[in-house]
Amino acid sequence: MAIEARDAEYHQSIKDALRSMGLSPKDLTAWLLRHPESILHKLGSFSADDQRKVATVTRYIRGTNPSVAPMTALRTAGALVYYSAKYGIPVHLSTAVAHTESRFDPKAVSNKGAMGIMQVMWRVHNGLLQANGIATKDDMFNPEKGVAAGCLLLSRYINAYGSIPKALARYYGGSSTAYFRKVNTKMANIRSSIYPQ
């Protein structure tokens, strides 16, 4: 009965996204029982609009990188929507950065040591991240914590530098027109998916 009650909490867009990946709300509920710390426990309490964003971003992730496992895509999308709102940044920005940085691969590691979906440099930011509940460098490979780290940094850079282009240059580690163009193109694509005319 508890599983059926939880099913009703999910917006139809979430149910449709799950179905498109061969899953159901019951599969999600069973997964949540095994993962008590997941941000997806909050999914049923997200507004209908935010649940629709999670569904749209999940489909975007799977569409751009089908090798991302269905639950990883849903966790990543849930984290992108949740932490973008928490840190006051547009979800299409955080999603575009994750796509550009790693193609949504939570195990990605750059040759410079950037890790996870958002390609965060643990050795540079560990103090800030630990102060915000991201305890170890292995947390960078958890899609939800990796997204939390990236959104936190993007928010700080936007606040410090006053614009998205300057924040992206800082996030990237230097000025790069090519990087900004990639992120900007992806932002436009994601924005049109999330906010169709």
Where are the predicted features?
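N-terminal secretion targeting segments of exported proteins
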Residues: 1-9
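Catalytic glycan-binding domains that act on GlcNAc-containing polysaccharides
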Residues: 29-197
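Short, cationic interaction patches enriched in Lys/Arg with P/S/T/G and frequent prolines
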Residues: 8-38
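Hydrophobic alpha-helical targeting segments used for export or membrane insertion
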Residues: 1, 16-19, 59, 188
